[in-house]
Amino acid sequence: MNRLIVKYAGYSVNKAYVAVDGQTLKFGKNGECAFETEKSAVTVSVFNVLEAASASYYLWSILYFFISIFGIFDSYRDFKCRKIEAEFIVRLSGETRVTVRNRAFNKKGESEAVSIECDCGYEVVKNTQYIDKPAKRRTRIMTAVRIVLFIGVIVLIAVIAGNL
């Protein structure tokens, strides 16, 4: 039985998921997770899911805008829409430790998404991060809509207060 111990050290902005052979890992408080398998090699994937990439983004964004009292108590979102796609084939022998670290984003274009440190050998299948253009466009449109809604609410409050 081979054992893979994965440690993920990443920026919280990226909110990336780590999966081994398609099974998403849940990390403990120490940032490590163990995965046991009979295979001699496993596929480690690192990816993120952008909120703005979903088809219902506009609906949910408007709903959260009103629930969060017109955006005042809204949670932080990555408005830069950075997409992470990395996949590695890691060869196992006994207990293998893998550390996955996020890399800084290169503004000039595509860059490596993560760096990996491994006790045994590994092979890079893909390792890119880039800006998701459709998600970025949706984010810009929604930001403009939120600004217009916020100004509309302030005008509505002013009109109601003026009539009293």
Predicted regions and their residues:
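Short loop/turn and low-complexity linker motifs enriched in small/turn-promoting residues
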Residues: 1-164
